[in-house]
Design a protein with these regions (language model features):
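Acidic helix N-cap motif at the loop->helix transition within catalytic regions
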Residues: 5-9, 32-40, 85
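Conserved donor nucleotide-binding strand/loop of the catalytic core
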Residues: 35-68
């Protein structure tokens, strides 16, 4: 959403890397020149008429992947933070797992900050409800195999959030693995996750994992 400042450089770095798959831009009702940049550069994109938010945009991409019979889909931000050299590792990881998370903290300690405190709370909530340890639950760089693509495409309110991952572990027997990655700084624009929004997000995720996800129905394989 509104990533005109970094979209072209992100896609060009993707195309210049060893990545040899397809890509699709999800324009989530952006008010900037995102759509024009896609048309000018002939980038394949879905142009959503209104801003659906992260969950809606993500599910639109998953519906596309499911309808076109992809067996792997990778969530990749347009702000320049995600690095394309890690895509092959994520793709390989979902050959034997359902979800692969690009993790900054598999081998590194989390820095001390309010945002990382929230990440720790979510990590504990996932551990309590699923028995699994996910060191970087808020990472936005994730890969999904064909089974998860179908679940995400057909399910209601399935977004790329820690509470959904927790639910899929508990109710769909999803196998989740973390792949060590490095991430860059945002190259343009501003993140919506300022201090206030980050605190609200972390609290909402923690409550959802602890109290809401555990009562949702199990889904079949």
């Amino acid at each position: 959403y509104n990533e005109e400042g970094s979209l072209a450089s992100t896609i060009e770095s993707l195309k210049a890397s060893s990545f040899d798959g397809d890509y699709l831009v999800i324009n989530d009702g952006s008010k900037d020149r995102t759509a024009e940049i896609c048309r000018e550069n002939e980038y394949p994109f879905l142009d959503l008429p209104v801003n659906l938010g992260l969950a809606g945009a993500f599910q639109a991409g998953m519906k596309y992947a499911y309808r076109h019979h992809y067996d792997c889909a990778i969530q990749f931000d347009a702000d320049g933070q995600h690095l394309p050299e890690y895509i092959p590792l994520l793709e390989k990881a979902v050959q034997e797992n359902d979800i692969a998370i690009g993790s900054r903290f598999v081998t590194k300690k989390k820095p001390s900050s309010m945002r990382m405190l929230g990440s720790n709370l979510i990590e504990v909530a996932i551990k309590l409800t699923t028995g699994e340890t996910i060191k970087d639950p808020t990472s936005g760089m994730r890969a999904f195999n064909g089974r998860m693509i179908e679940q995400m495409a057909k399910g209601l309110n399935f977004g790329p959030e820690p509470d959904t991952v927790s639910y899929l572990i508990k109710r769909a027997d999803a196998k989740v693995v973390e792949v060590p990655v490095e991430m860059a700084e945002r190259t343009a624009g501003e993140s919506y996750l300022n201090l206030g929004n980050s605190a609200k997000y972390m609290l909402r995720m923690t409550v959802s994992i602890l109290f809401m996800q555990v009562i949702r129905k199990r889904i079949g394989r």
